[in-house]
Amino acid sequence: VETKADLVVVGAGPAGSAAAAWAARAGNDVLVIDSASFPRDKPCGDGLTPRAVAECERLGLGDWLDTRIRHRGLRMSGFGGEVEVGWPGPSFPSTGSAVARLELDDRIRKVAEDSGARMMLGTKAVAVHHDSSRRVVSLTLADGTEVGCRQLIVADGARSSLGRELGRRWHQETVYGVAARGYLATARADDPWLTSHLELRGPDGSKDKVLPGYGWIFPLGNGEVNIGVGALSTSKRPADLALRPLINYYTDLRRDEWGFDGPPRAVSSALLPMGGAVSGVAGPNWMLIGDAAACVNPLNGEGIDYGMETGRLAAELLDCRDLSRVWPALLQEHYGRGFSIARRLALLLTFQRFLPTTGPIAMRSPRLMTIAVRVMANLVTDDDADWVARAWRGAGRLSRLVDRRVPFS
């Protein structure tokens, strides 16, 4: 073994870097391994909900985030209406933000580095090695280097090749997301609202069909917006759409309104396991976090907040002797109810008539849309005592009782 550390973190995105920062601050010897060299891009909407802002502030990035754009809430359009809803929920900051992942991820990674974590970038972990008790004792990198570890956190993203090596399985009978995004210059890049178009239709022959997803325009405050389209899918009802023609069509629909010139640049797409739809998230001395553990909100595709949260929670468990049951149980405690009911609601959106029937009713009620924004962004905590929070938690408990497969199992 050429290199070793108390804790090896595979993946230097928001989840891995947050875990590394918290673990290093607690006095652990931490090594972060990532196949990419930073800064690097990542397909994402770049939006930060108040939940994500809270986690950035907890990590010490509040002052840095104050130098970036702040958003008041969501502007939602579709079905003949438009409504602006300020970020609701008493337990989180009153503003969100949006920062390109090229910049955000490297900034969070530097927090981990400044906290004492070592970095091995531009090299991929390709294999894990166990002892007789199934504890991971070392990893092999693509260049043949052996890295020894006492504990391992896997944060290598939605496809999680190392997670598959450890036995992770993705269950596609619940909803997952497909999305594409790009960037466009506009004079409206400082607009203080994240814009979502809920009546998403495709080009050509599919114009008469509302797709199970939404289009978005997220101002970045730097002269550009992140523009994208996303749709929900299941193994039984796959989203039958070509993302690049769809994002180009969506851009053309919004061109005059936003003053866009030309096609989006840097278009890239992603596949998103959601709502804890994976099993095999832990072993005796290892844990999957963030996108690798399908910690993505099924109702809005948001994953940065859950990534940073699970990184912090994982770092708090490093003294645990056996994580095999402790980590899945903790994930279920924190996210099980919310993910279960969100998966169920998102599944309804994949039925062709659901959105055209309910969308016009919801858009006519600002109060209903305020509730929708709050639960869609999961701006509900166990400490919130209002009726919306109680109803959401109760619905989550009922939903879990009838789940064929509960989240993270």
Which residues are covered by each model-predicted region?
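Glycine-rich FAD pyrophosphate-binding loop
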Residues: 8, 24-44
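C-terminal helical "tail/cap" subdomain of flavin- and related membrane-associated enzymes
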Residues: 316-409
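Conserved Rossmann-like nucleotide-cofactor binding loop
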Residues: 15, 38, 159
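Redox-cofactor binding/interface segments in oxidoreductases and associated redox assembly factors
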Residues: 10, 154-155, 288
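Predominantly flavin-linked oxidoreductase catalytic cores and closely associated redox partners
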Residues: 111-260
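A conserved beta-strand/loop capping segment in the N-terminal third of enzymes
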Residues: 53, 57-107
